[in-house]
Regions:
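Conserved phosphate-binding elements of NTP-dependent enzyme cores
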Residues: 1-221
Length: 221
């Protein structure tokens, strides 16, 4: 590891397995990083859609549902949901893709649907356009997906859409999504979490929600 500063002789952290910094720095550096991908929801949804009859009939695999590299991504914007316009004498302007209207997916992806226990059918592009609160209702019988979305809701992020670009999130939103991801992971030992001003800019109700989540982290070790 790195050499200790001269004024530090020794660091003892007996029983501590990990130290993790959860700050307000931006998540991701480009538009391909979304709330669903960072919260580990999108990969699970791709597997679920690959098991549907619609996908099997068309011989699509989980990888085909990736908007980054899959066969079902929009052929015009290559899954970014936007295109750049060359404006003379001015910086390029990014606008929603005219082919997929910003959904990132090609037309066939909209035809492959998952049917929940309520008999409602949704395509993956439809789910990605939903906010967390709405997606919770649509995926109530998908245990792992529902659990991860529920954590986002409990952190006061139910208004975010699954397809929202993470670089565009505020510092407070980014920090809470990082917390949600930690809560969704299986515990692998005692962990110290270092948070950088986690309540800055939060409403009192959201501060209360955050405090409850921190108590849960503490209880998990």
């Amino acid at each position: 590891g790195e050499r200790l500063p001269k004024h530090v002789k020794n660091i003892s952290a007996e029983g501590i397995s990990h130290v993790k910094l959860i700050d307000a720095s931006p998540i991701g550096i480009n538009v391909r990083s979304t709330v669903a991908t960072y919260a580990n929801v999108h990969d699970e949804l791709r597997k679920i859609y690959a098991r549907t009859a619609d996908a099997k009939n068309r011989k699509y695999k989980a990888g085909d549902f990736s908007y980054n590299t899959g066969k079902l991504r929009c052929p015009v914007c290559d899954g970014t949901g936007q295109i750049s316009l060359d404006v003379q004498f001015l910086p390029d302007v990014d606008v929603p893709c005219p082919e997929c209207s910003g959904s990132r997916y090609g037309k066939e992806a909209w035809q492959i649907c998952y049917e929940n226990k309520q008999g409602e059918r949704y395509s993956l592009p439809q789910l990605m356009e939903m906010d967390v609160n709405t997606a919770l209702l649509a995926t109530s019988d998908l245990k792992l997906v529902h659990q991860r979305l529920q954590v986002l809701k409990e952190l006061g992020l139910g208004y975010l859409t699954l397809g929202e670009e993470t670089p565009s999130l505020s510092g407070g939103e980014a920090q809470r999504i990082k917390l949600a991801t930690e809560l969704s992971r299986r515990s692998t030992g005692k962990t110290i979490y270092i948070l950088d001003e986690p309540t800055t800019g939060l409403h009192f109700a959201d501060v209360h929600k955050l405090t409850e989540i921190l108590h849960r982290l503490s209880a998990d070790g």
